[in-house]
Amino acid sequence: MREAVAEGLGTIGAPAVDSVVRSLSSPERSDGSLAALERLSLVGRGDDVRRFAAQAVASALESYGLGSPIEPGGDERLHLLKDSLLARADRDAVIGLRAAALLGDRSAMSVALESLSVTDPAQRANALEVIESVGARDIVRPLLWMWDGATPRRSDPDWLQRLSRDPDDWIRACADLLIGPEEESSMTQTLDTLPLMQRVLFLRQVHLFAELPPPDLKPIAMVAEEHAFSDGETIAEQGDPGDAMHIIVSGDVSIVVKADGQERVIAVRSSGDVIGEMAVITSRPRMAGLVAAGPVRVLSIGRLQFESILRERPETSLGVIRVLCQRLAEPMDAGGPG
């Protein structure tokens, strides 16, 4: 959708430039606005784009300065806040660089900009050097320090209170999680439902979502429904439509196959494991049943919601592929047929 809108604005040409440049200041529109400007001539709005790029880089450095010195230890809440600040720094830095790239030789910068999406620091450093050499050196250079992994000293003793007033809803929620009463974070609490931020903390431990930035876990946590099952209760029947996948919050789940009138447990999954995702992805009936082996709590995500997540989050698709590869490799690991 974003690309289609950008293409449409690109065909309008110069008359669209003013409104697109103005929309850069809106956080929810800046990404799409940059995509449109990459197809347009700036026609006299270069100074505005330069100011926006400098502001984005300054915001990135501020978030990095707040997040980098945090030493989480074993506190999952501190890990969440630190990773969220660094993810915001990363996002703002890339936005600033995309804006800076509009001020120079765009064709020379295109490959470098693509390299900014990778996580390898060496590739990013090379991309920054290319962008710096082509133009906007004063904007780009401060980011070299950030992506070199330097850790600044913290000078503000009230940094956490400051973050609790941050304009970003997500950062405020992460800060409030630390300022408020400490909650059980092992996911074994006996509440009827997990609070939203506790769901996010749990999802960070699930390898299916390990590559997602923390803010991207919030919509997943919001659509997931919590269910509890008693010992021996069926979670899903073999042959049923794969209309939902489940993430085990606590307890064990037996994977059961029925054949020739006999039931056989082929695997047991536990907390943090994802079950039922293969039927959801393939749109085929479930190849095995899911039975609670003792008290079990799960977070369930419906097929439509999961497909939407895969479309919007390519990193999640990669996680799914890894899970499927592991599932396919298990018979070989057990000495069975490949």
Positions of the model-derived regions?
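A small-molecule sensor/coupling module
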Residues: Q198-R199, D216-P219, V280, P285-M287, ...
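Short inter-helical turns and helix N-cap capping residues of alpha-solenoid HEAT/ARM repeat scaffolds
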Residues: M1, S25-R29, A89, T119-P121, ...
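Amphipathic alpha-helical scaffolding segments comprising HEAT/armadillo-like alpha-solenoid repeats
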Residues: I12-S25, V43-S59, D75-L80, D105-L116, ...
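Structural detector for internal amphipathic alpha-helices that build alpha-solenoid repeat scaffolds
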Residues: M1-I12, S19-S23, D31-V43, G65-P72, ...
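Regulatory nucleotide-sensing modules
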Residues: M197-G261, V265, I275
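Short beta-strand His + acidic residue motifs that chelate non-heme Fe in jelly-roll/DSBH
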Residues: I255-V256, E277-M278, A288-A292, S308
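Long, acidic (Asp/Glu-rich), low-complexity accessory segments flanking structured domains
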Residues: S271-G272
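C-terminal accessory/binding modules appended to enzymatic or scaffolding proteins
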Residues: L85-M109, N126, R153-P181, R199-R204, ...
